[in-house]
């Protein structure tokens, strides 16, 4: 036995030491290569919070249009939801206002996003009105509906400046700086950002690798707007979704008055100008708010919330077959689109101001009713 311990224990000690070193190195490598490993802790300064998006590991992207940057926050919200989230917060505007010590008429909910891991919802809120409004991020528990403010005093974060952000012009009909970022989506290791730039073709779409290093100039866009009967470069994309068409990656972008444009991701090169195809024109006097792509009963759909047209359910099975609209044709209002993607109107959904996908079957809906704003979860129609 003495010989056994004398020979085996030293060898066992060596094995354990080697194993410990391997575990340490793997752990260190994993941490260094993770998005959180690229962040530093401290106070985050925001001038505004205009749009939200989620990336890997529960990272929350916050667009600061007035600050001309995008901030990535470690929400530390990484625990997967084991049950289906059913967010239901009636009078959410009143509850947000109470949380922030003010009244509902003194807040604005700018965006809604659901964390795809935890299923908790996050709201980009302005406390106050005008240039003195204070940006706040509010978390809504996916199960209890409890609201809490996300502290920015000591949080891990990183940021990237948008080098081609437009200058502030308070005398303009609408300050272009406020539309530096209109929407964001994360996919395939990149954050796609729509909005305005300081270029002659002001409408821009930016593709920013994450973890952040730097942001190049965006790609500037000219579209054919059938409702207006002209080419346009000044209006930003209001909302968009990454989408695969015939095996190729596209951005499906919706603009005010309501052209739907497909933009090849391969065309997005810094500082260039592109002229993508308009494949639908859903009608003037309307602003699209949010888009949610999904699959149901073997078919592909895109849900679009709008200010005037209500919530539309676009049939997206064969987007590659729709010809480009290159003349002033407008689909008629009876769902018989003479040039564009067919759709149905979801009459049960009214007053919708924000949408965010919860999972493959459900969507979070922020809507305005007679008694204020309500946040609910419904099955995708």
Which sequence ranges carry the predicted segments?
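N-terminal secretory signal peptides that target proteins for export/translocation
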Residues: 1-10
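Bacterial N-terminal signal peptides
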Residues: 13-24
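Cleavable N-terminal signal peptides
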Residues: 18-19, 29-31
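Sequence/structural signature of beta-propeller domains
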Residues: 30-381
């Amino acid at each position: 036995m003495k010989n056994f311990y004398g020979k085996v224990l030293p060898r066992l000690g060596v094995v354990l030491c080697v194993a410990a070193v391997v575990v340490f190195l793997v752990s260190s490598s994993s941490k260094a290569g993770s998005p959180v490993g690229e962040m530093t802790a401290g106070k985050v300064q925001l001038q505004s919070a205009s749009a939200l998006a989620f990336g890997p590991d529960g990272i929350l992207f916050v667009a600061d249009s007035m600050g001309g940057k995008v901030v990535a926050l470690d929400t530390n919200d990484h625990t997967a939801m084991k049950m289906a989230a059913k967010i239901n917060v009636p009078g959410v505007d009143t509850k947000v206002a109470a949380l922030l010590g003010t009244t509902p008429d003194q807040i604005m909910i700018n965006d809604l996003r659901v964390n795809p891991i935890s299923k908790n919802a996050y709201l980009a809120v302005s406390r106050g009105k005008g240039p003195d409004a204070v940006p706040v991020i509010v978390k809504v528990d996916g199960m209890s509906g409890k609201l809490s403010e996300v502290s920015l005093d000591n949080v891990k974060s990183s940021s990237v400046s948008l080098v081609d952000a437009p200058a502030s012009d308070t005398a303009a009909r609408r300050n272009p700086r406020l539309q530096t970022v209109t929407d964001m989506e994360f996919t395939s290791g990149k954050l796609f950002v729509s909005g305005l730039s300081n270029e002659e073709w002001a409408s821009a779409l930016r593709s920013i690798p994450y973890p952040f290093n730097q942001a190049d100039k965006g790609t500037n866009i000219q579209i054919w707007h059938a409702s207006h009967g002209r080419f346009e470069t000044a209006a930003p994309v209001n909302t968009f979704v990454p989408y695969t068409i015939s095996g190729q990656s596209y951005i499906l972008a919706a603009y005010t008055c309501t052209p739907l444009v497909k933009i090849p991701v391969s065309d997005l090169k810094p500082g260039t100008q592109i002229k993508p195809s308009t494949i639908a024109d859903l009608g003037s006097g309307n602003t699209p708010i949010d888009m949610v792509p999904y699959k149901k009963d073997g078919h592909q759909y895109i849900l679009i919330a709008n200010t005037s047209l209500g919530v539309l359910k676009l049939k997206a099975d064969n987007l590659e077959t729709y010809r480009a609209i290159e003349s002033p044709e407008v689909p008629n209002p009876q769902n018989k689109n003479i040039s564009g993607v067919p759709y149905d109107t979801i009459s049960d959904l009214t007053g919708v101001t924000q949408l965010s996908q919860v999972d493959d079957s459900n969507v979070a809906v922020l809507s305005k009713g007679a008694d204020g704003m309500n946040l609910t979860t419904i099955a995708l129609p």
